[in-house]
């Protein structure tokens, strides 16, 4: 029997400069759905450019809690999280408080 696939919290950079966070157990399939316009309503109106980050979680419930936490954060905290993941240079970091969804 195959082990269950981990769930991922992911963050997309959209064409309008905004971020979109979501969860999936198949990141490539979900990103392609966003690109085709068959993903979330938000990404239909604001098409994604790239996946900025993703983090695996053991199950959907844990990934959903992390997604909720991330979506509660202001843009500055999201940028801090991206910098902590090594996806933005240190000078782009707006504050010293890393976001650690769990």
UniProtKB/Swiss-Prot annotation:
Annotated ranges, domain GIY-YIG: 5-80
CDD domains in the record: GIY-YIG_UPF0213 (cd10456)
Cystines in this chain: none
InterPro entries documented for this protein: GIY-YIG_endonuc (IPR000305), GIY-YIG_endonuc_sf (IPR035901), UPF0213_domain (IPR050190)
Annotated family: Belongs to the UPF0213 family.
Protein name: UPF0213 protein XCC3072
Organism annotation: Xanthomonas campestris pv. campestris (strain ATCC 33913 / DSM 3586 / NCPPB 528 / LMG 568 / P 25)
